[in-house]
């Protein structure tokens, strides 16, 4: 039986929620990943160092006994952010600030309305070597939802990089050929996280044969040519600029299957197996370890994990749902098969 042993991966983009939801989902990530970069879009958002440290304590308390998993904490960037907050965050071990353009995604109401007014804050981030994580979509209602990432590149990303050229930027959960091209052409201070869904699915998987609410995420799935461009990027010559970031975003089944369903896919349960499928299909299994376990750590300036995990070429059926607080959670590829399995 074929096996593949790799350095234990890190998830560089993860939503863990809070309370009972946190307790339900964190064990799935903790058994696969050594560390994860924790998104700050709680209600209310994680905007201060005190907020982040309190949230980290709640995550640690929710971990299974004996787990060595480490959450890497971030702050939610708001219009009120200051250079002083950046210095305070760096001193407290916060790894990054996250940009949510106001209204772009789940719990983004407190997001930034005009990033260019925060240039002094971004300059301080560059000075302190603290990362800037970007949800790269414009929220202009006149821009088609499928074009919002490409528009963001021209309107925001390129001008910001021109004004703060040494800022370390992660273009999060990229979905388009344009985003891949930007990262490929930018300096070594720009990298990207890529989700399993944007490497495996296209917008037909969301819309053909009926609306598939469990395939609805933001940024929304794009056409097949974009998916292929992402696979080419993560397996190509400059693959070191791309890394694993699941954007696993749990929402109760009832919140997904309704007239105005929430955006987000829960992939943490089988994340590494899903990525293995991508790299296997691309004939690039030898590049999975760098993508999952090395590139993110290098960009964040942290050491690689010292232990390993082993994948077995063995089919598994993903559960139709799992418990989630008072309700249930539908994982990515619920009821379907994945050709790999992590040995636990």
From Swiss-Prot:
Give Gene Ontology CC terms.
cytoplasm
A Pfam family of the record is Amidohydro_1
Q: Where is the active site?
A: 247
Modified sites of kind N6-carboxylysine: 98
Highest taxon listed in the record's lineage: Bacteria
One annotated GO molecular function: dihydroorotase activity
GO biological process terms held by the UniProt record? 'de novo' pyrimidine nucleobase biosynthetic process; 'de novo' UMP biosynthetic process
Binding, substrate: 15-17, 41, 135, 218, 251, 263
Q: Which family does it belong to?
A: Belongs to the metallo-dependent hydrolases superfamily. DHOase family. Class II DHOase subfamily.
Function, as annotated, reads:
Catalyzes the reversible cyclization of carbamoyl aspartate to dihydroorotate.
In Swiss-Prot or TrEMBL terms, this protein is called Dihydroorotase
Protein's organism: Neisseria meningitidis serogroup C / serotype 2a (strain ATCC 700532 / DSM 15464 / FAM18)
